[in-house]
Design a protein with these regions (language model features):
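Conserved redox-cofactor binding core of oxidoreductases
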Residues: 56-72, 77-83, 93-98, 102, ...
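Core beta-strand elements of the Rossmann-like FAD/NAD(P) dinucleotide-binding domain
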Residues: 2-3, 276-285, 289
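N-terminal Rossmann-like FAD-binding beta1-loop-alpha1 element of flavoenzymes
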Residues: 5-30
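Glycine-rich Rossmann-fold phosphate-binding loop(s) that bind the pyrophosphate
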Residues: 10-11, 33, 290, 494
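Conserved beta-strand-loop-beta-strand element in the redox core of flavoprotein oxidoreductases
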Residues: 258-280
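Mid-to-C-terminal "cap/lid" subdomains and adjacent gly/pro-rich loops that border
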Residues: 35, 46-84, 284-392, 526
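A glycine-rich dinucleotide-binding beta-alpha-beta segment and adjacent secondary-structure elements
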Residues: 89-90, 201-206, 217-224, 231, ...
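Glycine-rich FAD pyrophosphate-binding loop
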Residues: 22-47
Length: 526
């Protein structure tokens, strides 16, 4: 049986493309590679569980202590036992190999939205100048997606216009004392010379501050890293039951390899993940939304795009610690574990850096202790004294500062090589100087040695491999994401982005996927 549309991937892009089609009455099949059920997050409040839960090692480290042992993982979320099924097996299943680059993806239902930071923003006109459609073409889709998933963080601050989302966002949850003190001083001293060019405000998040459908608002449990039992943090997996009720079909456990042209549609070739047995699915149209890297591997294999080097966009990262010097040694208190504040800085070159500030009090202490350059016992003491007076910062830099390449070998393996140069180092050093000066003006210090560059690819913001063009060549996409050389195959994820801003891109990707779904629903009837 040939479906009207098969969507490969059930992450944010896949479900956003699906909704307009399902609502229009199309026969839509969503396919992902998930097997089994996800491990539920712990129940309770983080600090209370740390004091009282006699089985906390199970969710902190895992039965095999993998969270403690796996020091190679680029992010704390990759070591969380309850999230192991989100990440495991991705590169192997999709035949992806890397050199100097972290290729992270998900085979789980909901994809990487099971473990993302929930940061959202709307790309502005300048950031979308290279996209071959009008910025206003996304207006209806931004509104629909934002209302569907629920946003918070609305504030009259320096970042309202920058994020462009406050008409759809609710108020944000309360800030902890460190974040509240930092933003209060910033608002009082915005004219200070050290703060010129640095914009600071509330983080805008796909987080509920009031109930939405079956999802409950945030209760500040502090367990965000492990997953949210209340559904306050958005995951595309939350939408799958509603899509099925509306008429969509689901097929799980299938890893897609390539697509073959038929006389009147397409045949999707894959393997059953649990058995390795080959399987096929037929459809009039196919939408690839498996995440940029997996989507690229599928598309390039289908196009026989062998031994041709292509770019991979990704945001270089850096991390740092801010210390509030006036309040060392406070006892930790319950509070938020998600990003509380965001910042934006534009370099003299005009390029943008974006970042967020978190409380470390609801993250495993060993994630910080291991970076303190002293003995383990001394590091624990230092962190016990200072940890409750710190904020953790992460920063995303322009994708143009890195030069990653991908190539598909004739045996179908996608190989990605990470590359960067002195320009990236200089930009990180420049941002570090900005923050050191700004922190002093705000009553904080950047802890010495803490402004460190992350592994290339560890941002997990991959894009640009199948870029949109006004007149696409083979292997590029048109203004709706249709893949040149494969009419009837569409790309819904960030592989279509011709450029990648440092600003969070997921909501823009979802709006583009919604626009694609509306387009497909309008050009043919079921």
């Amino acid at each position: 049986m040939a479906h009207d549309v098969v969507i490969i991937g059930t992450g944010p892009a896949g479900v956003s493309a699906a909704w307009p089609l399902v609502q229009a009455g199309f026969d839509v099949l969503l396919v992902d590679a998930s097997i089994g059920s996800p491990t539920p997050p712990p129940e309770g409040e983080y600090l209370d569980l740390r004091r009282r839960d006699t089985n906390q090692q199970d969710w902190m480290f895992g039965n095999d202590m993998a969270a403690w042992i796996d020091r190679a993982a680029t992010s704390p979320k990759l070591r969380v036992p309850t999230l192991r099924a989100v990440f495991e097996g991705f590169a192997e299943a999709n035949r992806i190999e890397t050199d100097n680059f972290a290729a992270i993806g998900s085979l789980a239902s909901g994809g990487l939205s099971n473990a993302w930071g929930c940061g959202v923003a709307r790309y502005d006109r300048d950031e979308m100048a290279a996209f071959p459609f009008a910025h206003a073409d996304l207006d209806a889709s931004f509104a629909a997606v934002s209302r569907r998933i629920g946003l918070s963080g609305r504030a009259e601050d320096a970042l309202g216009d920058y994020f462009g989302l406050d008409e759809w966002a609710g108020a944000g949850p309360p800030l902890d004392e460190n974040a509240a003190g930092l933003i209060r001083r910033y608002e009082a001293r915005r004219s200070h010379k050290a703060l010129q060019g640095l914009r600071l405000g509330r983080a805008r998040l796909a987080l509920l501050s009031s109930n939405l459908g079956q999802r409950q608002s945030c209760d500040l449990s502090g367990l965000c890293l492990w997953g949210c039992r209340r559904g306050a943090l958005y995951s595309a997996a939350q939408e799958l039951p509603e899509l099925e009720k509306a008429g969509a079909r689901m097929r799980t456990g299938v890893v897609v390899d390539h697509i073959e042209k038929l006389e009147a549609g397409w045949r999707v070739h894959g393997v059953e993940r649990s058995t390795g047995a080959p399987t096929v699915i037929e459809a009039r149209r196919v939408v690839l939304a498996a995440g940029t890297l997996a989507t690229t591997a599928i598309a390039w294999r289908s196009l026989r795009h062998y031994e041709k080097s292509g770019r991979v966009l990704s945001n270089p990262t850096a991390a740092f610690l801010l210390l509030r010097a006036a309040l060392p040694g406070r006892a930790p208190v319950p509070g938020p574990a998600f990003a509380q504040l965001s910042f934006a800085h534009r370099f003299a070159s005009g390029e943008l850096a974006h970042g967020a500030l978190f409380s470390p009090g609801h993250l495993p202490a060993f994630e910080f202790i291991k970076h303190i350059p002293t003995s383990r016992s001394a590091a624990r003491l230092i962190w016990r004294l200072l940890g409750s007076s710190t904020l953790v910062g992460n920063a995303f830099l322009p994708a143009k500062l890195a030069h990653h390449r991908a190539i598909l070998s004739r045996d179908g393996v996608l190989r990605i090589t990470g590359q960067s140069g002195d320009e990236l180092t200089r930009s990180i050093d420049a941002l570090a100087r900005v923050w050191r000066s700004a922190a002093r003006a705000l009553g904080f210090l950047v802890m010495p040695g803490s402004f460190a560059m992350g592994q290339l690819g560890s941002d997990i913001h991959y894009a640009g491999t199948l870029p949109m063009r006004a007149e696409p060549d083979i292997g590029e996409t048109d203004c709706f994401g249709e893949l040149a050389g494969m009419p009837g195959v569409f790309i819904a994820d960030a592989a279509t982005f011709p450029e990648l801003s440092a600003k969070p891109h997921t909501l823009t990707m979802m709006a583009m996927a919604d626009r694609l779904g509306r387009h497909l629903a309008g050009v043919s009837r079921p």
